[in-house]
Amino acid sequence: MNNPNIYQLAVTGVQKLIPYKAGKPIEELERELGLTQIIKLASNENPLGPGKQAIAAIQKALPELALYPDGSGFHLKQALATKYALDASQITLGNGSNELLELVARAFLTPELEVVFSQHAFAVYPLVTQAVGATAVVVPAKEYGHDLAGMVQAVTAKTRLVFIANPNNPTGTLLAQAELEQFIGALPDNVICVLDEAYFEFVSQSAAINSIDWLKKFPNLIITRTFSKAYGLAGLRVGYSLSC
């Protein structure tokens, strides 16, 4: 074949991908629109920015930028393990929680398998599903949130992953502990529930769910979290997952 189109050499799922449209940087909007005072809400970035201790730690690390980082993230894993009373082996770090969603898809999906998630769910779920050639099964939303009964019914012998964001992104709906725990318990052992908790820090104390306790009960549960939102560190791209 002479002069092949390089895109035709990519796997089918990648060929059909529509790029994820992230919120535009303020500087880009200023150039496009000729404006100088823009308040950006598109990406749910923390308007307060990172904490003083985080800024101090970043400044302290600047002289080491010429060195490759610790690929295992030893110190961060140890800190998270201490915070959540887990073993460091239960923690996986990622380039934001987005990368962890991609890694889960690559690790567990093949073209003949299916992924279940809700309508109005995080836009990355269909992208990571399509990239590996798996089939997305989208369950109609219930009052802009998850129809858990409908999602259980959508599970078939081909289902390998279920994505749930709680609170949901972008609609903000919240599932209660009892109903979510019952849902995970209803899944077959060979169906992995990925619980995306990017916004869990914003839930009121009275409505908060201690999902980490479920790791002892559900070996098919993976929890993803991020430092991008509540901690104001979106620019550093630091996410992590918790599993059994």
Could you describe each region identified by the protein language model?
Residues Q37, D87-I91, P111-E114, K158, ...:
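Short acidic capping loops at alpha-helix termini that bridge into adjacent secondary structure
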Residues L65-E114, V132:
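Phosphate-binding glycine-rich loop
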Residues S72, N220-C244:
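PLP-dependent aminotransferase class I/II
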Residues A107-I164:
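PLP-dependent aminotransferase-like
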Residues H146-K158, P170-C193, E197-A230:
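Active-site pre-lysine segment of PLP-dependent enzymes
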